[in-house]
Regions:
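NAD(P)H dinucleotide-binding glycine-rich loop of Rossmann-like/cofactor-binding domains
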Residues: 106, 123-221
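Glycine-centered, small-residue-biased loops immediately flanking beta-strands
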Residues: 308-309, 334
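Adenosine-nucleotide cofactor-binding segment
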Residues: 217-223, 233-299
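Acidic carboxylate diad motif detector
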Residues: 313-314
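C-terminal substrate-binding/catalytic core of Rossmann-like NAD(P)-dependent dehydrogenases/reductases
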Residues: 273, 277, 281, 318-370, ...
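Glycine-rich beta-strand-centered segment in the early N-terminal region that forms part
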Residues: 53-67, 77-128, 133, 184-186
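C-terminal hydrophobic helical "lid"/dimerization subdomain
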Residues: 24-31, 298-302, 347-400
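N-terminal Rossmann-fold NAD(P) dinucleotide-binding loop
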Residues: 227-228
């Protein structure tokens, strides 16, 4: 599953926060917008008219051009990832700067930007040690801006939480400056939006986290948006054999386009590990769980050769567990590691991914299998739930 973290607040916490936010921002200037909202678990998403407050100190308002429809957004609507509702969805967005707050010098009106759901402070232990994707500031801004407030309000004036500190399934959004990356204006914004999560998460899992080596063997479980990018990350890194694993023939066919040398449909199969071990000629050097299920992580670990590395990429439900044999782990020298947001360094990695796309090496055009208007958002989520291959993108107006 595409990367995000959930946080469950008590009703008292939410009510207290809402009252504080309402008092603080009653007099703020706002921008009317339409946004895609989740109000109740398991219910269809709705398109609502909201108000987006103008940027405060250290913040930027963007006019969205496009937003990818990510499985993490779906997980927030069904409770797989726990988020306080109501919630403005979206964390995979690209757009144009519409206004800047006090003290903002990195961005100017008219700049093209991509959202990053990891808010990087640059000061904590993780940022200072070269692991900004683990920045503690992000943990304080899972459904708000880093200051604990929101800039989004519904028609009744009630505050709306924002998914992953972004909430970019909206015509306008106000984000903290640390949640944005400036990009080349020549880059198509609907393609750029994909880099914000699905591409960065999958590609980065292969290139940044696992550091796939040329000539190696890799197995990728799950060929959704993240899995396809893990496949092409392995391909660009020079893996000699890349096995794509899924239950959908359509997704497996698409995986070939992204660099898979072999495919394996697990539908009805019981001896998955043995079959993949044989297919890879004695096990894989790298295996990726891009679905987000404990049992699939176990399968990924099991298909490794001695000394191999399994990477869990998708975010599982909080109660899901991984069970491994401790003796087996010790004597095989295998490694199991997590990859959050593809171990991203957004300010460095986003421009590099764009350069790869513009040179023809990174496939983004092929990733988009359908675009939707904001009014078609419920259909976009239904298609995602049904397992439509590739990535759906919501396009706002005519600026993509």
């Amino acid at each position: 599953m595409d990367s995000a973290i959930g946080l469950q607040l008590s009703s008292n916490d939410c009510e207290r926060r809402d009252a504080q936010v309402r008092r603080r921002y009653d007099d703020a200037v706002s921008q009317p917008s339409r946004a895609i909202i989740a109000r109740q678990l398991g219910s269809t998403v709705a398109v609502e008219r909201i108000e987006v407050q103008s940027p405060r100190q250290g913040e930027v308002m963007i006019r969205l051009a496009a937003c990818g429809v990510c499985h993490s957004d779906l997980s927030a609507t069904n409770g797989t990832i726990a988020y306080p509702l109501p919630l403005v969805l979206g964390h995979e967005g690209a757009g144009i700067v519409a206004a800047v707050g006090e003290g903002v010098s990195r961005y100017a009106i008219g700049d093209h930007v991509v959202s990053s759901f990891v808010s990087i402070c640059g000061r904590c232990h993780y940022c200072q040690s070269g692991r900004p994707h683990l920045c503690l500031q992000s943990l304080r801004a899972l459904h708000t801006l880093p200051d604990g407030g929101v800039r989004t309000f519904d028609a009744a004036g009630s505050p709306l939480n924002v998914f992953c500190g972004c909430g970019v399934m909206s015509e306008y959004a106000t984000l903290h400056v640390d949640n944005l990356v400036k990009i080349d204006r020549q880059m198509p914004l609907d393609r750029a939006a994909l880099i914000a999560c699905g591409v960065m998460t999958g590609f980065g899992a292969a290139v940044n986290t696992a550091r796939v080596e040329a000539g190696s063997v890799a197995v990728v479980f799950g060929c959704g948006g993240v899995g396809l990018n893990a496949v092409q990350g392995c391909a660009i890194a020079g893996a000699a054999m890349i096995v794509a694993v899924d239950t959908s023939e359509a997704k497996l066919e698409l995986a070939k386009c992204f660099g898979a040398t072999h495919t394996y449909n697990v539908t009805g199969q019981e001896q998955i590990g043995k079959a993949l071990y044989k297919m890879t000629g004695g096990g894989a050097d790298y295996a990726f769980d891009c679905v987000g299920l404990g049992r699939i992580t176990e399968q990924a670990f099991g298909v490794l050769r001695r000394g191999g590395t399994a990477v869990t990429v998708g975010i599982a439900a909080a109660a899901d567990q991984i069970v491994l044999n401790a003796q087996h782990v010790a004597i095989t020298g295998k490694t199991l590691t997590g990859s959050y947001y593809g171990s991203a360094r957004p300010q460095l990695d986003f421009p590099r991914l764009i350069a790869l796309y513009r040179s023809g090496r990174l496939k983004l055009d092929e990733l988009i299998t359908r675009t939707y208007s904001i009014a078609e958002a419920p259909q976009a989520f239904a298609d995602l739930q049904a397992g439509r291959p590739g990535r759906g993108v919501i396009v706002f107006g005519d600026i993509a």
